Amino acid sequence: KSVGLPELAGTKTELDGKEETSAEFKEFLRKKVFMNPIIWILAISDFFVYIVRFAILDWGPTFLQESRGLSSEMAGWTVAIFEVMGVCGMLTAGVISDKLFKGRSQRTCVFCMAGVLLFISLFVMLPETTNPTLLLAFLAISGFFIYGPQALIGVIASNQATKKAASTANGVVGFVSYISVAVSGVGFGFISDHFGWQWVFITMIVIAVLGL
């Protein structure tokens, strides 16, 4: 604990916390959550992850119709495939984090965001005559990678805040991340109207880099 590591479950330090006063608990939350820079770094990272996710969900079908000439039905499948691949990616990220990285979820998040960055970049570079199936495949693979960090960042925050403050830490991270819904909707709509779709995806790539 003296070097900033979380308390282990069942240790004397954690058990003593059961007898603490309300003021002591508030001080614990202040130190472990609200004044913990790691929690805020995680919250900001999750904010960027959610921006990319909702940008694809909200604007992906519109882009495919307006810029690539896909039918509304074909473009609509983007959302369904994106979500299914996202669930698969989330489960895979959990296994990789436990088995390959021995619980070091931060490494899994970096790996996944690098995958998002790669496939969104490749998607942007595809010519307008690209087969629609390939377009959907690239967006689906992006979904596979982006849902892993979304799930694991909450786990990392819980570990940092300890079991006693895990819910509060997740609440802070979740609150900040969901602000991205408004930013994604309004921000990318403005960019597409004034600068074109190319800049929407360039902005998305920059945000994916920040999410790393």
What do these predicted ranges mean?
Residues 3-41, 67:
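Juxtamembrane intracellular "pre-TM" segments in multi-pass secondary transporters
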Residues 36-91, 150, 184-185:
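Extracytoplasmic gate region of multi-pass secondary transporters
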Residues 90-103, 192-193:
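Helix-to-loop junctions at the C-terminal end of transmembrane segments
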Residues 99-113:
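Cytoplasmic membrane-interface "Motif A"-like loop-to-helix N-cap segments
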Residues 104-107, 190-207:
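A membrane-interface helix-boundary motif in multi-pass transporters
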Residues 114-128:
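C-terminal ends and interior cores of transmembrane alpha-helices
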Residues 147-162:
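Intracellular juxtamembrane helix-capping segments at the cytosolic ends
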Residues 163-194:
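A late C-terminal transmembrane helix in Major Facilitator Superfamily
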